[in-house]
Amino acid sequence: CGLLVYYPLATGALSGKYRNGKMPKNSRQALFKGWERHLNPLAMKAYEEYYKLAKENNMTMAQLAQAFVNTRPFVTSNIIGATTMDQLKENIDSVNIELTDEIIDKINIIHNNNPNPSP
């Protein structure tokens, strides 16, 4: 028994596609209203910190998020989503990323500084 992770990239927000106020034309956020909770100011602050951490460690924001999800001992499966082949490859490649204890500690600090960013 375990957890099946659904939307591990917060409807694309943890992919970095919405950074700096961007709203890609055919993105979920642009096409479907009601997902705005993932783009509130607290969430955007957290995403920016995750982006910087990913960059510092030579990975994408999506890879950081997926790799973190995959380290959780209670996760039995992680539903990845992709619109393009590049996104699919990026998500699949996250399986081979090993996060150090230091990176996991930094992820937890970001989370603790931005609790419940997408209520």
Please place each PLM-identified region on the residue numbering.
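Short, intrinsically disordered/low-complexity patches at protein termini
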Residues: 28, 39, 84, 103, ...
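Aromatic-lined glycan-binding groove of carbohydrate-active enzymes
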Residues: 1-27
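Residue-level marker of structural boundaries
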Residues: 19, 23, 74, 97, ...
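Glycine-rich loops and low-complexity Gly/Arg-rich segments
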Residues: 2-4, 27-32, 102-106
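Short alpha-helical linear motifs
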Residues: 20, 87-92, 105-106
